[in-house]
Every structure is written in structure tokens, then in C-alpha cells.
Amino acid sequence: ICNGQWTSVGSAGLYYTIKADSMCVDIHYTDGFIQPSCQGLQVIGPCNRYQNGPRDFVACQTSGGSGHPICIQSTNGNIELCANCYCPQ
């Protein structure tokens, strides 16, 4: 479990929180389930929310690993956490 502040994010009735420190990102769902981020990535920037039509993104700038942002994509109630996916700029 990461250190840092929890930030609440809501999407289409699905609410979860995100917490990031220099090494990881935690996703905490309302049902209490916590999913850690991919290992080997360092969060070097704040997490931001992006909305693109029905898609809802939360992206954290990272270094290490692929170097791509960690992106949480929520579409139709589904969330994917990936280290190498498209995040809107």
C-alpha cells in the first residue's frame, strides 16, 4: 500500500480512490478492494483525471519501466490499470 493522499474519482456511478507516492499507485474501490499498480514504475507527477466521451481516465506521470503514464481507464463500469496504454493529453 502506497503512502500519500487519497484522491476520490467518480465515473458513471463507479467511485474509487487513487493514492500515489514515488514508487506506486494504489486503487481503492468502494467495495474495499485495493489493487496496486505495476511494479518498477516511479510516479514523478500528479495524477490527473481526463474525460473523453464515455471514457474516464486517470493518469499519473511516471518514469522507469516503460516510461509511459499509468492510466486507469473506466468505461461502462470497467476499470483497467495498465502501464503502457493510451492516455489523452
Curated annotation (Swiss-Prot):
Q: Could you confirm whether the keyword Disulfide bond appears in this record?
A: yes
Gene Ontology MF terms: toxin activity
The known PTMs are summarized as: Contains disulfide bonds which may also be involved in dimerization.
Record PTM Glutamine amide, positions in chain:
89
Keywords, in A-Z order: Amidation, Disulfide bond, Toxin
**Subunit structure, interactors included:** Homodimer.
Q: What does this protein do?
A: Blocks calcium currents via interaction with a yet unknown target protein. Has no effect on L-type, T-type, N-type or P/Q-type voltage-gated calcium channels (VGCC). Has no effect on voltage-gated potassium or chloride channels. Blocks non-L-type VGCC calcium currents in mouse duodenal myocytes (IC(50)=0.2 uM). Blocks calcium influx induced by hypoxia/reoxygenation in rat hepatocytes.
Which protein is depicted?
Answer: Mapacalcine
Q: Which organism is it from?
A: Pione vastifica
Q: What is the lineage of its organism?
A: Eukaryota, Metazoa, Porifera, Demospongiae, Heteroscleromorpha
